[in-house]
Every structure is written in structure tokens, then in C-alpha cells.
Amino acid sequence: MKKILLIILAVVVVAAGATMVILSTNKPTVVQRDKIEDALFCYLNIDQLAKKGAFDKYITSEQRKMWASMATANVENQDIATHIESIITNFNNSGIDFTKPVYGYLDNYKNFVFVAEVADAIAVDNSINTLSYLIELDGEEPIEISQIDDERSFDIGENVFGLYNSKRFTIVMGENEMLATSVSEAAHRNLADCSIFGNSDIATYINANKIKDLLYESELVDNDVDDAVAQDLSQYLGEDAHIISSLTFEPGRIVATNNCYNFNTEKFEGLFKRCNNDHLDYISEDAIAVLNFGLEGQILSELITEFINSDLSNILGIDLHNEERMALAVACDAIESINGDTTIVLESIDGTLRERFNYYTGDVNYLPEMKSFKAAMMMDVSDSYIITNVGQYAMGLLVKVDDNHYASQFGNYNITLLQRENLLFGGVNMKPTKAEYPASKAIWAKDIEESYGYAIINFNSLRESKFTGSIYDILIEELGLEYDNTLRSLKQMLSYAYTTSEDILCNKSVVVLNDESTNSLEQFTSILIPVIISEMSASIF
């Protein structure tokens, strides 16, 4: 296991280091590429990440030479030391062509395969020999390279097998007897066609049917429950059902997407509705957090009832007693009233910083103490069923003000529950009055148009609030972190974050930074790299 961790660490270090400096290569590459048909496929565009991170701007050649000297201080073999130094100063000297994307996949033998294109096979030889030397220094068996014509192979323990030639480098990790077969197939099959990932920096592809088969194959299915779940999942998976997830660093934004293709969703047709966003008029534009989704309650109620009465529910052991079925029926009746947007909002939090004297140190600390908050839940409803029943079963906690209008007060919290036409409103220190500066005009409003559902976190509001903004600084001081200015800089970077679904089977999550002109990865690089350099330099001297 120690050897496996070493090889994984070596791959990660080489890949991460390559993002610091990438040089072009004129080596030929395989032109023909195969469609991705693996159960799981992972993609990493190191060249693109390196350029977006602008690492060369923040890491000088002198600093890399200094790190190389530090890394080889205890290496007596001069050839090994020279090769380590050459890799640190230029990571393409490892022999791997990091100007090309690298990827990994789960093959038919349930082994994970790592694939990269080769720039210089001789340099890869030197890199493997260097790794072997370092492993031997650690008291482990060295790595031996076997070569037949242009192909070299090696193994590390029983669970890691590698093979490479002048075109590509492959490593297989697994726990079965098919490692050699896996790596041989990986080395000779065409490279994967990664065009489906577009301009993504990091991405994954999941073949839903193959993953399902791997999870529920015959030797793993040891009871009726697993088999029933597998069969139930099958009805939703089309012939080429797959999921593509990606992470991309853009100017001022970090974008993560998750898209599902060829799934059978006819059963849920009409369940979700596009949000009309009318509720945003009752919310302030500087609200801390907003959750909104469009729903057809009648269909949801039918789906719940269908599931409770299904064979799958019976196999799963969901056996409701009479009282539970009555409660579920009441809940479904309430759900059926929902007909459109449901919105939950946390508009603000108010509090004070209470002084706390430490008698042992003589220091005065400040403890955040929440006094109140403003929050609400709004629903588009088709009738007055919900508010009528809430009023009926409130048991004196709510006082009737008028028809379909209830209120109460607990300390600093004023509770309002009322319905106006088709709007059901429940608020804590909030009422259904139009905001002077509504959330429909907020900086994030343009990002959630034509959505089936979305969630927003407004970092600007959290930071600018006297109470919530001070909590972050207090936490830093309490933790006694050395680089508190760095953490404060990271705090200043964030503007807002949102996740939205413009299609029922597609989701996009975005972190928006206040500087929208500079690539988001470079913004993090500019803050974090100087800290890392300072820390590493300090460890040398």
C-alpha cells in the first residue's frame, strides 16, 4: 500500500507541478481518437490550467532552482539529483507531454487507468529510475523497467502496473489479476475523443448503465432489495444515458456544470415549472440567501402516493401504519395546493459582539451573539387549504388577525402567516410588502432567469453586514492563524454564488468574484502562491 501511495503521490506532484510551467513540443500525437464508452472517465487539461493560473507570473526561475536544490539536498546520486532538478525547473523534463490533456478511466475489469501522452520516452525512463531510487531509499523494493522494442513496463507491488512507449504513458491501479491486460489495452487503444468536454479545465463522464451494472452485478446482488433498486433505476436510463460534469475557471467566475443526457423523465413530466420570480419583489436585493423552485404539487403528491403503494416500497420495508398513512394523506393534500414558485429567503441577521474577559490571560475577546433575523417562506398556491389547517392546528401559538391572516410574537421575533389570493406568506420579522430595492434588480438576478430552480448566497451582504462581517475576522483572530491577511483577501474576493437549473436535467453552479476581468484561477494564484513561496523559503533558511 505504501508503494501505491508513493506512485499516486508522484503522479499528482508531476501533474500539479506541470501547471506551473508548460513548454510546447513538436512530438507527433495519435490522430485517431475513440468515443468515450467507459463507465467512468476523468479529464484534466493541465496546459489550460497553467495558462489560466499564470503561475509563471508568480513563480520565478530562481525560486524553482532554490526548491530543486532543497529537494536534492540528501540525494547522493548526482545523475538522480540532476534529473530531479531538471523536472522541478521544467516539469516537461519528466517526459510526459503536459501540453496535452491527461485522463483516467474505469475499465471493464474495474481497474482505474491513468493515461498521458509522452513527449520523450527516454526522459520517462529517467523519471521512473528516479522514483525507483527514492523508493529504495525508503527501504522498499526498487522499480525495474522491462523493455521490448519501444514498449517499457514496470510494476509497483501487486496493485500498480505501468506501461509506456514513445506515444503514451499508462498506469493501472486495481486489485485483480487483470492489471496487465488493462494496461496493455490502454497502451494500444486509440486515445479518447475529449471534444465533448469543450473548454472545460476538469471534467468527468459517467456512463449510467455501466456504473449501475458495476454496482449491481450478479456477485454483488445478495438480496432482493439490491435487485429491486437496480431494476427500478433501469426504467430511467436510456440506451446511452450519461452524465458530464465539468469545472472551468473563467474571468471573474468559477463555473461547475452537471448535465444528464438520455435519461427517461417522462414520468416526471410537468412536475417542475419554470420560476416566475414574482416573489423577488418582496425581498431586498441585499438578501443573504435565497432558494426558489417551481413545482406542480398535484403531480408530486401523485408520485409520492404511487411510490408508497409500489412493490419497491414494499421490498424496501416501508410499511406505514394507519396513523402514518393519515398524516401522509394530510401532507399530500397540502402539497397538492402548491402551484408554482416556492421561495425561502434569509434576508438579514442582526446581533452584537459581546465582550468576554479572559481572567487567565487578561485579554478581552468578543463573542458574536445573534439578536434577531429576517426570513420568510412564500408559495404560489391554488387554494387556502394550507393556511386553513395551520390556523386550525396552531394550538394558540398563532393569533387570528383576519381571514387567512395569523400573527404571533416571541421576543424579538414577529411571526406573520397570511394568504393574499394565490400567495401564501410566512415570515419572521418580514411582511409581504414590496421592497424598495427588490431582489429582482439584484446583481445576481440576470443569472437565474428562465430557471426551474436556483439558490443564491450573497457574500457581499455577509461581508458588509456589521454583525456577520465581523464574525469572519473574529474567527481568524481566535484561530491565531499566521496568514490572516491572506484569508481576509480571500474574503474580499467573493461577490456571490448561485446554482441554477435552466433545464430539468442540467445544473450550473457559479462562484462570482468581485474582479470580473481577471481569470478566477489567477486571482487565487496571486494570493496563495506568495504564501506558499514564503513558507517554503522559510523552511530552507
PLM-predicted stretches and their roles:
Residues 1-4:
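Positively charged n-region of N-terminal signal peptides that target proteins for export
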Residues 431-541:
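Long, C-terminal catalytic modules of enzymes
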Residues 42, 85-200, 336-455:
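Single conserved position on a long alpha-helix in the C-terminal lobe of the eukaryotic protein kinase
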Residues 104, 160-165, 231-252, 342-346, ...:
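Broad, structure-driven detector of short, well-ordered beta-strand segments within folded domains
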Residues 74-75, 174-181, 227-244, 317-326, ...:
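Extended, charge-rich low-complexity interaction segments
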Residues 168-171, 243-263, 372-380, 424-427, ...:
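Short, hydrophobic/proline-enriched secondary-structure or compact coil segments at domain edges
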Residues 6, 15-152, 196-238, 254-365, ...:
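Structural boundary/hinge residues at secondary-structure and domain interfaces
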